[in-house]
């Protein structure tokens, strides 16, 4: 399997290319499980909205966070999409 990188994610999700491509270790949706090199998708659930934890995720070493809320979009490392769940599904389909 080819390695995953930030350029592939941005290209797949129709986002602007980053100034510097970076390898991605994992795709993560649990903010408690972040490691250096992860990309975090901030999903909104019935009880929690992961956007509330985006700053913590970035501080824990995430390479990038995929967000849909405007208040998170300005953070360094944030990539804004319309719908984070749809973006995660699109990335998964492209990666198969």
What are these regions (language model features)?
Residues 1-90:
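N-terminal leader/targeting and accessory segments in enzymes
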């Amino acid at each position: 399997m080819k390695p995953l990188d930030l350029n592939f994610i941005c290209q797949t999700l129709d986002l602007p290319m980053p100034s510097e491509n970076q390898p991605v270790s994992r795709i993560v949706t649990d903010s408690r499980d972040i490691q250096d090199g992860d990309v975090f998708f901030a999903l909104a659930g019935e009880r929690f909205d992961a956007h509330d934890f985006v700053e913590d995720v970035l501080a824990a070493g995430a390479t990038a966070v995929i967000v849909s809320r405007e208040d998170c979009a300005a953070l360094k490392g944030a990539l804004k999409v319309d719908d984070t769940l749809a973006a995660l599904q699109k990335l998964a389909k492209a990666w198969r």
